[in-house]
């Protein structure tokens, strides 16, 4: 049964293949530019994550505001009805 299931990523390179890819990268870009490329790639990933978090926060605020507004209006209505009951009982 499990022999027929194909892996999610069938062509991921292993140890020797990664060494060949690393050698090609060094030959293409040179050893001096690799740290700069790694640094800029890390910064790009960080900016992408910050942007994603900002969008997630905005979406939560948008969906959360509706729920909070409903809860606030309900609690306001409860306090108004409680105040009116206490005022009527004082008279």
UniProtKB/Swiss-Prot annotation:
Residues 73-91 have a biased composition (Low complexity). InterPro entries: TatA/B/E, TatA/E. Its main location: membrane. One of its GO terms (cellular component) is cytoplasm. Keywords: Cell membrane, Cytoplasm, Membrane, Protein transport, Translocation, Transmembrane, Transmembrane helix, Transport. The chain crosses the membrane at residues 9-29. It is found in: Cell membrane; Cytoplasm. One of its GO terms (biological process) is protein transport by the Tat complex. Residues 48-91 are annotated as: Disordered. Pfam families: TatA_B_E. It comes from the Archaea. It is a single-pass membrane protein. Residues 54-72 have a biased composition (Acidic residues). H.volcanii possesses two TatA translocases: TatAo and TatAt. Each may interact with specific Tat substrates. Belongs to the TatA/E family. PANTHER family: SEC-INDEPENDENT PROTEIN TRANSLOCASE PROTEIN TATA. Forms a complex with TatC. Cytoplasmic and membrane-bound TatA form high-molecular-weight complexes. Part of the twin-arginine translocation (Tat) system that transports large folded proteins containing a characteristic twin-arginine motif in their signal peptide across membranes. TatA could form the protein-conducting channel of the Tat system. This is Sec-independent protein translocase protein TatAt. It comes from Haloferax volcanii (strain ATCC 29605 / DSM 3757 / JCM 8879 / NBRC 14742 / NCIMB 2012 / VKM B-1768 / DS2) (Halobacterium volcanii). The gene is tatAt.
């Amino acid at each position: 049964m499990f022999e027929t299931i194909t892996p999610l990523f069938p062509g991921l390179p292993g140890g020797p293949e990664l060494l060949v890819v690393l050698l090609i990268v060094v030959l293409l870009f040179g050893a001096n530019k690799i740290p700069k490329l790694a640094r800029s790639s890390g910064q790009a990933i960080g900016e992408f994550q910050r942007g994603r978090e900002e969008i997630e926060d905005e979406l939560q605020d948008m969906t959360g505001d509706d729920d909070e507004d409903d809860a606030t209006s309900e609690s306001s209505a409860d306090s108004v009805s409680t105040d009116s009951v206490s005022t009527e009982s004082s008279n």
